[in-house]
Curated annotation (Swiss-Prot):
It comes from Clostridium botulinum (strain Eklund 17B / Type B). GO terms for biological process: translation. The lineage of its organism: Bacteria, Bacillati, Bacillota, Clostridia, Eubacteriales. The keyword Ribosomal protein applies. This is Small ribosomal subunit protein bS20. GO terms for molecular function: small ribosomal subunit rRNA binding; structural constituent of ribosome.
Length: 87
């Protein structure tokens, strides 16, 4: 356990940031699964609307540093390819 005041603060801050990052990642995974389900069900209209949400979520996560920007770009590219294959 930390004895120095700044170390104690860092522990609190790290726990808070970890929780926020976990929430963002969880929401991201949920919306990606929703998109995958729409693609699997051949629901083009729903897939298009969910794709916009996926793109926004990936951009937010990348801008906040939760995921790497290249990972976000790769995911968007692969999901866009799936969407285009449906149409």
């Amino acid at each position: 356990m930390a004895n120095i005041k700044s170390a104690k603060k860092r522990i609190k801050v790290t726990e808070t940031k970890t929780l926020n990052n976990r929430m963002i990642k969880s929401a991201l995974k949920t919306v990606i699964k929703k998109f995958e389900a729409a693609v699997a069900g051949n629901n083009v209209e729903e897939a298009k609307t969910v794709f916009v949400a996926v793109t926004k979520s990936l951009d937010v996560a990348a801008s906040k540093g939760v995921v790497h920007k290249n990972m976000a770009a790769r995911k968007k590219s692969r999901l866009a390819a799936k969407l285009n294959a449906m149409a």
